[in-house]
Curated annotation (Swiss-Prot):
Molecular function as annotated in GO: nucleotide binding
Protein purpose: Nucleotide-binding protein.
Keyword hit for Zinc: no
Similarity comment: Belongs to the YajQ family.
Gene Ontology CC terms, in alphabetical order: cytosol
Organism this protein belongs to: Campylobacter jejuni subsp. jejuni serotype O:23/36 (strain 81-176)
UniProt name for this protein: Nucleotide-binding protein CJJ81176_0398
Keywords assigned by UniProt, alphabetized: Nucleotide-binding
Length: 163
C-alpha cells in the first residue's frame, strides 16, 4: 500500500463530448419549428473549442446559445466553462462561445488557496495547467474533491490519476 496518495485537478474537456453536443445542437436546429425560415448556423472550431453561432435575428441568436448550452449540459460539460467571446451585428448577428479547457493561473490560485484554507492534511502544488494534491489518507483527497466541486469556478473541473 502506498504511503502517499495523490490526484491531479484539471479542466480538460472531452473533445468527443464537445463534438457530440455540437452535432445534437445542429440536429435540433434543423428540426425546431420556431427557427424555420430564419437563416441560422452553428459551427464548431475543434482546435480552439469555439462555437460560432450566426442568425439573421438577434432574438434567435439567444435561442441558438440556449440550444448549445443545453446540449453541453446533457453531455456532462459544466455550463460555467462556456464564455461569450464576441457578439457582432450587421446583416447577420454572430456570437462566439469558447469552452475553457485549461486552468488559468487565477483559478489555480483560487483552488490552491481554498485547499490551504480548508486545514486538511494535504499538500497542493500548481503544475502548469494542473494542480497536484498529495495526502496520506484517501479520505482527505475525497474531501478536497468535494471542496473543489463546491467552488464557484468557470471551469469544467475533472480529477485524474488518483493513486
Amino acid at each position: 500500500m502506498a504511503s502517499e496518495h495523490s490526484f491531479d485537478i484539471s479542466a480538460a474537456l472531452d473533445k468527443q463530448e464537445l463534438k457530440n453536443a455540437f452535432e445534437q445542437a445542429k440536429k435540433e436546429l434543423d428540426s425546431r419549428y420556431d427557427l424555420k425560415g430564419i437563416k441560422c448556423e452553428i459551427d464548431l472550431s475543434e482546435k480552439e473549442n469555439i462555437f460560432k453561432l450566426s442568425s439573421s435575428s438577434e432574438g434567435k441568436l439567444d435561442v441558438l446559445k440556449d440550444i448549445v448550452i443545453s446540449k453541453l449540459i446533457k453531455r456532462g460539460i459544466n455550463p460555467n466553462a462556456i464564455k461569450e467571446l464576441s457578439r457582432e451585428s450587421g446583416a447577420m448577428f454572430r456570437l462566439n462561445l469558447k469552452a475553457n479547457d485549461a486552468i488559468d493561473s487565477e483559478n489555480a490560485k483560487k483552488i490552491n488557496k481554498a485547499i490551504k484554507d480548508s486545514k486538511l492534511k494535504v499538500n497542493s502544488s500548481i503544475r502548469g495547467e494542473e494542480i497536484r494534491v498529495v495526502a496520506k489518507q484517501i479520505d482527505d483527497l475525497q474531501a478536497v474533491m468535494k471542496l473543489v466541486k463546491e467552488l464557484d469556478l468557470e471551469l469544467n473541473v475533472s480529477f485524474k490519476n488518483l493513486k
